[in-house]
C-alpha cells in the first residue's frame, strides 16, 4: 500500500503514454486530497487519469443540470462521495417526519444519478456514526439516524443490482476494518471540511482504482497455493497426512481450516485454484484424499504441480496450462525464500508478504482486496471443472499424430445466437475478461450490451462450444456494425483463450459471411488495435484471408470480399 506522499508524488509523473480515463469526482465535503490520491493511485496502476473535480458541495446541482460542467466533461467514471457527516447534519436540522424519509430522499437521488449520470458510477457507501441519541433502542425508531443509515446502505446494494453501471465502494467496510478514529480526524474536519484522514486516503483510493481496473479488464483470475505450513500446519512428507495441523478445534489447525474455507469460497465464485509445492506428488495429494478435516479437495484444484523443481519454473508451467497472464495470478507461500524467488524471476505475479503467524493470514489478506471483480455469471461456478476437463482434452490430443483427426474426435457443437437477456451478463463479463484474443480491446457493461442488442445498426453473435468432454459455455462474441448497405465493420471480436486451436476462428468467420450474404452485404471490415496483451491476434485477419487496406505494422484495417470468400474447413457443427 502506498502512502499519501507517494501518491501525491506520482501525480507529477508523465502519464501521457498510459491508457486515458476521464474521471469525475463530486462530493459534499472537501475532496481535493481524495482527488490527489485517486489520480496518483491511477498513475501507479498504469492509468492516465484525467480528473475533473466538482466545486465543494455541488453534487446535486451538477447531476441535475444537463448543461453543467459535469456533462460537458463526459466522464468514463463518475465518483460520488456523500459523507455520513453531512447526512447526520441534515438529519439534525429537520423534524422527525423528515428524518424518517432521509434514506428514501437520498436513494431517490441515487436512482436519478443512475438514470442520468454518464459512464460508470462509483458511489461510496456510508460508514457508521453512532450518535447515541437513542442508544441501542435506535434500531426500533424509524426516524433515528442509525435506522436511516442502515436502511440507506442496505438499499444501495439493491440499487447496484438493478443498475449494472452502478458500483459501490465499500467505505463502511473499510471503516469497520480500520476503525473510525483511523478514518476521521475531528480537528482537521472542523477547520477544513476534510472528512477522510491522510492515512485512510491510500486505502480508499486503492479500493476505488480496484473497481475501475476490474471494469477495465485487469483483475486476478488464479490463486496459486503452496501446501506445507500454508494451507495446513506441518510438513506432510515428514509428518504424514494424518498428523498435519488442520481442523475446527482449538489451536493453529483452526487458522488453516478457516484459510481453506476462504479459498473454497474464492473457487466457488470463479477464481482458479492451483497448487505449487515442493513435494512428492503422491504425498502432497494424500491430505486432500484421506484427511477428513480438509476443506479443500482435489476437485477444487484446477492444476496440481508438486515436484522438486524451482517454483518459478513451476508457476510458468501453471501459466502455460491455464493460458492466462502472469499479472492475473496470486501466489501464496509461507516461505520468504520462495516468495522472493517468484518475485524476482516471474514478473507480474502478485506475491503477498504473508505474516509469520498463520492466525494472521486471513486478516492480512482481507486488507489487500486481491480479487476485486466487476461481474459474476453462472459460468464462473464451473471454471475449475472446465480447466480439469481441458486437461483431459490435452491428454487425448497427445494420443493423436494428426490434428484434424483429433479435432474430429471431439464432436464439437456450437450454438450461435444474438444477445438476449439470458446471455447479456456473460457477454459483458467475457468482454471484461478477454485480453489476449480481443481485436480492439473493447469493454462493455451489461447496460451497454443491452443497448447494442436493441440497436438495429448492429448485428450481434454469441457462440458456445461443447464437445465430448463437456460444455465450455459462451466462449466467443462478435458485434458487427452496419456501416452502409454493403459494408459490415467488426466492431468487436473477442474469444476465450480456452478454446484456441479448435477451429473456432474459421467457424465464426463462416457464420459472419453467411450472415453478410443473406443480408446483401458485400464486404466485411476488420480492425486490429494493439494493446499490451493482444499481440497474439496481430496477424488474425491476414491469416483468415483479409487484405490490409490501411494502417502500419501494428494498428491496421483489413477487408474481406464476401462474394469471393470460400468457406473454411472446421470440425464444429452448428447446433
Go through each PLM region and give its residues.
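Alpha-helical cap/lid subdomain in secreted, periplasmic
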Residues: 13-20, 37, 44-54, 60-198, ...
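Asp-based phosphoryl-transfer active-site loop
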Residues: 221-236
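Acyl-donor binding region in acyl/amide transferases
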Residues: 465-468, 474-551
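Substrate-recognition/cap helix-loop segment adjacent to the acidic, metal-dependent catalytic center
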Residues: 268, 279-306
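Terminal substrate-recognition subdomain of acyl/acetyltransferases
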Residues: 321, 343, 347-410, 514-575
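Short, acidic loop-to-helix structural element flanking the phosphoryl-transfer center
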Residues: 248-273, 312
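A conserved beta-strand-loop-helix scaffold within acyl/acetyltransferase catalytic domains
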Residues: 290, 415-495
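Conserved Lys-Pro-Asp/Glu-containing loop-to-beta segment of HAD-superfamily phosphomonoesterases
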Residues: 315-336, 342
